[in-house]
UniProtKB/Swiss-Prot annotation:
One of its GO terms (molecular function) is structural constituent of ribosome. This is Small ribosomal subunit protein uS19. It holds the Pfam family Ribosomal_S19. GO terms for cellular component: cytosolic small ribosomal subunit. Keywords: Ribonucleoprotein, Ribosomal protein, RNA-binding, rRNA-binding. Protein S19 forms a complex with S13 that binds strongly to the 16S ribosomal RNA. GO terms for biological process: ribosomal small subunit assembly; translation. Transmembrane segments: none annotated. The keyword Cell membrane does not apply.
Length: 133
């Protein structure tokens, strides 16, 4: 008996039951009702000058550099490239539909993962006997 292989197709993106096209046509106030409380409050209070400037640049060019790590990812930003500052450099972030409702800073990590290796020469008395490479 031959086994049938399943074809796995990528599912269409939906955010709380709405497709990306529906979200892009939706007014900002209506979109805010779908977002979590913190992001909803941020949109309700309005955007800062830098955030407005970022949105204008994205509409015009499609890419922008920014320090606005608090900016909420909106449906109109999907497909654009944003360079977000992480404290040292600008990290390239390509906006995908799954990022809607999150903050830009979540995708530009400020701390680097540091993997410490074994003890070095002269670390402690007990590490003298650890064979060196």
């Amino acid at each position: 008996m031959a086994l049938k292989s399943k074809v796995i197709r990528p599912r269409d993106f939906k955010y709380r039951g709405y497709t990306l096209e529906e979200l892009q046509k939706m007014p900002l106030e209506e979109l805010a009702k779908l977002l979590p409380a913190r992001e909803r409050r941020k949109i309700k209070r309005g955007f800062t000058e830098q955030e407005e400037k970022l949105l204008r640049k994205l509409r015009k060019k499609g890419t922008a550099r920014t320090h606005c790590r608090d900016m909420v990812v909106l449906p109109e930003m999907v497909g654009k490239v944003v360079f977000v500052h992480n404290g040292k450099e600008f990290v390239r972030v390509e906006i995908k539909p799954e990022m809607i409702g999150h903050r830009l800073g979540e995708f530009a990590l400020t701390r680097r993962f540091e993997k410490h290796s074994g003890p070095g020469v002269g670390a402690t008395r007990s590490s003298k006997y650890v064979p060196l490479k």
